[in-house]
Amino acid sequence: MQPVDTYTGLHFTVPAGNDDLGRPQTCTIDADLYKPHSAGPAARVPAILTTNGFGGSKADQAGLGMAFAGRGYAVLSYTGLGFPDSGCKISLDDPGVDGVAASSLVTFLGGGGTAPYSSSDVAGAAGGPGTLEVDFTVLDDAANHDPRLGMIGGSYGGQIQFATAARDSRVDTLVPLITWNDLRYSLAPNNTSLARGVTYADSAPGTQKIGWTGLFFGVGILDGLQGAAVDPARNVGCPNFVLEACQAKATLDTLGYPTSDTYQLTDRVSVAHYIDKVTVPTFLIQGENDTLFNLQESVATYRSLKARGVPVTMAWQSWGHSGGTGDNTGAAPGELDLTGQHIEDTYLGLRIRNWFDHQLKGSKVSTGPEFAYFRDWVPYTGTAAPAYASASSYPVGTRRTWYLSSADDLVTSRKAVLPGSTSWSNPGLGAPASYSEVSGLEGQVSLPAGVTTPYDTPGTFGAWSTPPLSSPVDVVGSPTLDVQFDSPAVALTQAAGPSGQLQVFAKLYDVAPDGSKTLVHKLISPVRVADVTQPVHIELPAIVHRVDAGHRLQLVLASTDAAYKNAYAVQPVTVHASPTSPAALSIPVVP
């Protein structure tokens, strides 16, 4: 690594679309710049723009800034709008607000304008305030202040990349980690009636994730209070969020599902709805352990980009918003470290470095397979590369089908299906009878063992299990379920709208020989059935999981879940086992 010069407390005042009243607004941005000491007008380097995840700040990317500056990049790390110490309200990575603001930073990195800073460290010598003009980046078009530039960041810092690239063609490549495709699905999923990707039909709204939405608003409001001195107006009206966000939260809290007004916001801030404007090579990285932005979101973005001929690769890493694998709250050992001298010693760190070197420096290095995924059952030492399997594209493997039979069995042949029925009901009044997780806390903080054990209350769910497996089954991808529900009571209420429609939560358990059960990464699949008289196709969460020999795979259809807004009315429901038209569970399996 080469020596790095730093400029901290860079201050920008940039245009950022319109405020809640439709008036043009400017916002302040706080940033730090990391520069290779040798970079200059005669030794120009590519640029990287990065920002924080939700509730974070520029400081979160300091390690990345130092690491990549030491490898020949100028890195600008900034605090996103609405977070301390940048101004304006949180607008959820809106291309017309956050994307416009980021575009001004692209201009700065292309030599357009200057920015004051509070301190510097150049060649190991600390300095006081000054003004910085960038004259050390590679320019693709000097007249348009167009630097050779890539973006990287996770979660909220992932979506901003799409928002910026959609507004600014000067961005050359993206590396978004653990971010969303469609926020309507992320915050209120419905895993049936999917029109495309994870985007469900407006007429088939999802079910609110009460844990995640509550956590986000709490964090955002707290950030507004902490940053009040920077921009007191951010706490006026809807506290530290654009007005539409408060309105959407009120709708979700009241109804438990989104409406057309909610969609106007979520569609505007989701790449699913403007992906035709994203045309640059993209390296998607998504987390296997993530109940906020699950693997289906990355698949939706991957497929949309690939269908339009945009170069795209996808990796599924071990960790996400819900923690890591085993005792790790973050990346597995040797998987990802972007903070120092050991980038090349981690599987994804090396791939990201090579990606930028190839896309921004033109280096003839491998950018890796189009699809790769972490397998937590593979032992290794050092780099996590041995734990990653790869493929030339997604999906992978073949599908195996089990049919729902009587006696709560899953069988592999239609002929083996025995007639019967399984019935259950929710408690009503919105009360949960099943538990999957404490959203946002599990995997991040230590919780009592009993608190983290998923459960389903007898009489409120249906379950079907395979016999003990004779050999391991490796599941990679999204299982699906085709099923017909029978609920005369709901058939009478569903015409009244979403509140009268059947709610079901589908999930897969790994059942050990001793009867203990594992809900893989606490992932479940909420479904709101628009018409209970018609067959339903359900997409369960994508997983990467080995079901060991001697274990059983169990499908559960629950009436409620404590992490979601549940039905108020009592909804008795039955699934009939029929040899002529059995419900079918399809599992993607790799050798």
Regions found by a protein language model. Give the residues of each.
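C-terminal, loop-rich substrate-recognition/catalytic regions characterized by aromatic stacking residues
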Residues: A332-P333, D337-P591
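Short beta-strand/loop motif that positions the catalytic acidic residue
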Residues: V278, L284-Q286, D290
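N-terminal cap/lid segment of alpha/beta-hydrolase-fold proteins
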Residues: M1-A43, L469-S471
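Conserved alpha/beta-hydrolase "acid-adjacent" motif
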Residues: T291-E297
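Accessory cap/linker subdomain of secreted extracellular hydrolases
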Residues: G70, D85, G99-A102, F108-N144, ...
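Acidic beta-to-alpha connecting loop that harbors the catalytic carboxylate
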Residues: E288-D290, W319, T560
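Catalytic histidine neighborhood in serine/cysteine hydrolases
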Residues: L305-A331
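Cap/lid segment of the alpha/beta-hydrolase catalytic domain
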Residues: G40-D140, D146-P147, G326-L338, Q501-Q503, ...
